[in-house]
Amino acid sequence: MKRRNADCSKLRRPLKRNRITEGIYGSTFLYLKFLVVWALVLLADFVLEFRFEYLWPFWLFIRSVYDSFRYQGLAFSVFFVCVAFTSNIICLLFIPIQWLFFAASTYVWVQYVWHTERGVCLPTVSLWILFVYIEAAIRFKDLKNFHVDLCRPFAAHCIGYPVVTLGFGFKSYVSYKMRLRKQKEVQKENEFYMQLLQQALPPEQQMLQKQEKEAEEAAKGLPDMDSSILIHHNGGIPANKKLSTTLPEIEYREKGKEKDKDAKKHNLGINNNNILQPVDSKIQEIEYMENHINSKRLNNDLVGSTENLLKEDSCTASSKNYKNASGVVNSSPRSHSATNGSIPSSSSKNEKKQKCTSKGPSAHKDLMENCIPNNQLSKPDALVRLEQDIKKLKADLQASRQVEQELRSQISALSSTERGIRSEMGQLRQENELLQNKLHNAVQMKQKDKQNISQLEKKLKAEQEARSFVEKQLMEEKKRKKLEEATAARAVAFAAASRGECTETLRSRIRELEAEGKKLTMDMKVKEEQIRELELKVQELRKYKENEKDTEVLMSALSAMQDKTQHLENSLSAETRIKLDLFSALGDAKRQLEIAQGQILQKDQEIKDLKQKIAEVMAVMPSITYSAATSPLSPVSPHYSSKFVETSPSGLDPNASVYQPLKK
């Protein structure tokens, strides 16, 4: 045991390595390498529009799955994959896209720099600040240049997989703490039983033990090591409480450090050994409980044997019951656990006890057989106590078997739940694909609606321009009408002087008004066709409104179109009113023309009467005077005659009060 302590101290010496003596060149080269790798990955991300740093956690996940399948079996590897996949789905669904990409990239680069040999120092902190600043200031906003749908599952894996590994690490840490607590409890019990064993030894052997301890302390100068090497059975049990760690704990910590180093080299902080299979851990705990119970039973038997040996020393008559003289328990603390009292049993009760204890572990069966002295035949209390211990051990074994059965049932339940989760995940994937297709179709419909709205806006602008042009024409027509009215008034004023010129001007004016009326009717037809087209478009928009309830923009566009159509209808009604006024003016002009023609006919009739009277007078007058009188009058023709009167009948009623257009 002395050599073991020396070897352990020698093994721990190389672990205390001084980092100050490391060269500056190596550290600067290391961080320069980090910067070069980071710059190359960012360049590849920008050129190929894909974030390659997300592939590193995926590669770690594949390695951890392979290690779990290799060392812990298929069931645990499948369970680990399902848990990781569930965590990835949760991160994918509930974390926004920008924050998901930011957290994933930041975590990858921080973890990459964290797992260095120097640990936390100024260069690592500066690199962390640089990475976080670049991710938050530049890459957090520029997500348009990347394939978001392709990178998003990998980003979710970068967050979900570390969460799963941290959960398994926390579980292993809690189990480790519980194991240490159990070891401390067992250590206290062993200390108590060791004190009982020491008190059961004869005083001479206690004096020898003290002398040996003093010699060891004087030789090595180790006053703190009292009785850490007394018993080799249940781990070293220190008598002095100053010794905080025993040899198994030191070896466990050294193994933990070696595992941490291997994890830093290979998995960069993700230790697969921390992911323990729950069934194996439960079986180990059951074995540990059985060993603890057997060790407790062995200690009780040893205590009973030492009491019997003390009685044997006090009573010489009871030495006949022993068949073997070597039944004295060795008093040296180093060889106590190696040499058990070889005292064979000689009665049927001990044989029954051996049959009952043969169901337990085979390693402790021989110890139980050898530790029962023969003078217990005369002690029924000890036998009763041993029988009670056997019953307790059987009950403990049954409880451990029940726990094992419960664990197996839990394993089957977990496998069934895993299958259900897989089926649910398939359904969720199908639903997600359907929703993505619907979203794509909705986006396409929205783009088409935008195009239709833009086209309608262009058409509305064209209609507004046409409307302004028509309004200008109407203003010009009004001006022309006023001018025509003024000219008509002037023509009426000069009608008495120039009857023939008035009729010609009136005819030309009538022709112009009819041409204008035809133009206006054509314009009205064109406007009516446009109104019909607009009404059809409005109906289409209403149908689209019924189909698409969420398109508020189209509703506003429809309302605007309705307002514009109403405005156009109002303008068209005003135009029709103007046309009616023009037709009424035309009727008035025709009536005036008919009246003028009637007056002309009356004048012609009067001229005829006058001519007849002149003829009668000339007939009465003498021929000389007649010839003289008629010679200058023969070439003269009346100015107003019936030849100039238009004989075409008019379709207008001169007695009509108000002009009424014909209904179509």
Swiss-Prot record:
State which gene encodes it.
Maco1
User: What keywords is this UniProt entry annotated with?
Assistant: Endoplasmic reticulum, Glycoprotein, Membrane, Nucleus, Phosphoprotein, Transmembrane, Transmembrane helix
- By what name is this protein known? Macoilin
Question: What is an annotated GO biological process for this record, any one?
Answer: brain development
Q: How does it sit in the membrane?
A: Multi-pass membrane protein
What species is this protein from?
Answer: Mus musculus (Mouse)
Q: In which tissues is it expressed?
A: Strong expression in whole nervous system up to 12.5 dpc. Highly expressed in all neuronal differentiation fields from 14.5 dpc to birth, with highest expression in the telencephalic cortical plate and mitral cells in the olfactory bulb, and lower expression in neuronal progenitor zones. Progressively decreased expression in fields of neuron precursor proliferation from 14.5 dpc and virtually undetectable there by 17.5 dpc. No significant expression detected outside the nervous system. After birth, significant expression remains in the cerebellum, olfactory bulb and hippocampus.
Q: Which family does it belong to?
A: Belongs to the macoilin family.
**Carbohydrate-modified residues:** 324, 340, 452, 655
